[in-house]
């Protein structure tokens, strides 16, 4: 393990454009597994520094899609730049409103399920760090309706749904007993 203080994480959060992040000299589990032939994917909130040297593709992941820092650090807060949605190392969209934010869990889930299907015949490591249940709280309307307007409950239920979708993909591909 690694205590946060050992690598300069002294209680301050990594803000967009900051100079701090996961030290590139640290060896991650993704880097170790890659040396053993694993495909590696990360889909969701990274929040370990948004400089390219800190991002998932520089830390042992073959694939990445998600947000580079917390979903409360977005232009809706006015003091932060637009929150990018990144694939690989490229921003392919920006989170500009609550409707965009409500799609983050589903997007990570869809990427994870696709990754499982594409790598079903070889070893893989899948890391899915959801931004839920973290404020600000946004969720897809159908989930909010099902949760009777309770947004915290809706976010918990969506993460539960996501886990179920990932487990279903493993079962569908005959991998459930090989994890």
Language model regions located:
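Formylglycine-dependent sulfatase
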Residues: 1-179
């Amino acid at each position: 393990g690694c205590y946060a203080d050992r690598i300069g994480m002294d209680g301050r959060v990594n803000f967009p454009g900051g100079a701090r992040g996961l030290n590139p000299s640290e060896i991650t589990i993704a880097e170790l597994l890659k040396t053993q032939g694993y495909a590696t994917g990360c889909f969701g909130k990274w929040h370990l520094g948004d400089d390219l040297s800190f991002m998932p593709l520089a830390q042992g992941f073959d694939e990445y899609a998600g947000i580079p820092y917390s979903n409360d650090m977005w232009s809706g807060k006015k003091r932060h730049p637009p929150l990018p949605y990144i694939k690989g190392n490229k921003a392919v969209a920006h989170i500009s409103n609550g409707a965009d934010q409500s799609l983050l869990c589903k997007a990570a889930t869809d990427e994870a399920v696709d990754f499982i299907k594409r790598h079903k015949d070889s070893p893989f490591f899948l890391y899915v760090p959801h931004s839920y249940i973290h404020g600000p709280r946004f969720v897809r309307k159908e989930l909010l309706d099902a949760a009777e307007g309770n947004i915290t409950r809706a976010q918990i239920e969506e993460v539960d749904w996501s886990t179920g979708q990932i487990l279903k993909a493993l079962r569908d591909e005959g991998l459930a007993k090989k994890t």
